[in-house]
Amino acid sequence: GHQKVLTQAKRKAKKDKLPFGVITFEPVPVMFFNSKLKNHRINSLIKKKKQLQRLKIDFLVIIKFDKDFSLITAENFIKKIIFNKLRSKYLFVSKNFRFGRRRIGNIKTLKKNEKFFNYRTIITPPYKKDTKTISSTLIRKRLSSGKIKEANQLLTRSWCVIGKVLKGKQRGRKIGFPTCNLSLDSYIVPRLGVYSVNISAN
């Protein structure tokens, strides 16, 4: 779903000779509001940056999502970020986009403020595959249930995690081949099982 939004935005920016940029939040808002939600990420911020670089974006705005920012109203978000900071001409969003304090802002809010702040809202329809709407929620379900191949098909790439190798109980010495304990940090944790993976190390 996100990829479709980005693709359409890039095409429009190129056509109108405008800079193409992306706004993202760190940490993920849902994780900020739910401290018990430890494993939710599909991507790390590092991985997200690399993917956006491949799309050749002109700029990336990373907004620190903290208590102060969570209190900003939808109207102030439009005024301070969309208008004052970015001077956006087009906003590409999915139909279920929510923003602002208590997630009150939606498509209607964006549309209502278009003329005053001189921008246009473009709503990207849901991307479907085999009658199923492709979304982050669906991808998380596939990953957490261990259906990595299906998740990769939805992502159109191989799922990747980045983490530190932790010292374990050194059981690899007893089973005849080396092992490593990888910290998944805030990533989705796949179902317990055996998986074939490719590894690169720094």
Regions of interest found by a model, annotated:
Residues 6-10, 49, 78-79, 107:
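Generic structural signal for well-ordered alpha-helices
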Residues 44-46, 51-58:
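ATP-dependent adenylation/nucleotidyltransferase module used to activate substrates
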